Amino acid sequence: GVSGCGSGSTRPARSTCFLPLYGHDVQEANDDTIPDDVAEKILRFARGAVAAGWMKNKAYVNIGAVTMGIAGSFCDAGILQKYFGIRAEWVDEVEILRRISIGIYDHDEYEKALAWVRENCKEGFDKNLGKNLPPVITKSKIVPADKDWEFIVKMTLIIRDILYGNPRLDEMGWHEEALGRNAVVGGFQGQRQWTDWLPNADFTEAIMASTFDWNGPKAPTPFATENDTCNGIAMMLGSLVSGSAPCFHDVRTYWSPEACERVTGQKPDGVAANGFIHLINSGATALDGSGACVDAEGNHVMKPFWEMTDADIKACLNATDWCRADYEYFRGGGYSSHFRCKAEMPVTMLRFNIVEGIGPVLQIAEGWTADLPDEIHNTIDKRTDPTWPTTWFCPRLTGQGAFTDVYSVMANWGCQPWCDRLWPCGC
């Protein structure tokens, strides 16, 4: 940057005349070090610049259309183009069935991925056992339960290929399919035209958003449940500036200390002393959200993908089991990425909204995940769907406005009770 800019001091605190990068202390003219506070500002700007450059001219790939009339699933192509420089593309879900039927996927990688899943993705409990399900449900599951993983792994490979392309397909003679859609973010409709008879995309969504798969560490793919475009954009923004996994959650319930004590017999304490918000998506969240990774000091963290180690990957896999989907609302079956975030770590909650007459609005709430006592967790968890991934969130409060208390944070959250994102806290 250019020093001086009209300032009369020898080495002014401002380090550039183009950006507001003010250092805290005036330096000597011959001091060529970059102060820590200025370095952090430069890095923040650089991360934002890289994110903006990376998304430009790429695409949001809608696989399917609007899910159950959800407002966030209405893809506004104009907003995407004008504000983010990305295109909107649509691919019908039937394309997945075409590629499975004809075999348009890397068969060698399929065998590798399936073997990895069988070795590392342990199955959880099956809540369908013992139920007397009506014919409308039993007749709807056309993929046999013992073939679910095979179908799901193929679907995952195919969706990834649709988004990014795959040169292996070109070698197989499928040139157009090998090109992909130049995606930077995407989403899958699923409900209900797909999930009423085929395995859901919970595994696909969870593993794509994670910082690893059967090939080892990888950049996470922002990939929205129910093709919730607004949440997909929030996932994209958070991942591009942090390099970490976007965790898709529904903002389900605010639990006051009083309500918690009445229902569970215990009052929360620690970071949850003022109450907490139950974050739980309908079966799919990046495995990084388990909080199983640890840094050099032993703190539980969500790491950028380039810092993920074999030990981190194993820890996330061990913290997660895969429960069969409830056939009463996922008739086609599937597997949910079930975990309980037992870490207490700083995170950022993020929501992208589109407000009529105003335009795009971004909501941000910093806070912590909470590790609640078993007596509290088990009681509340069973009130929803215990096969889904659960996180307890405690926002950082200011005593004013939307951050007056925990209830205010949830009450002011856009389009709730739908979704939010979690990332490592800060910029």
Question: What residue spans do the PLM features occupy?
Answer:
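An N-terminal assembly and electron-transfer interface module characteristic of large anaerobic redox
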Residues: 1-427
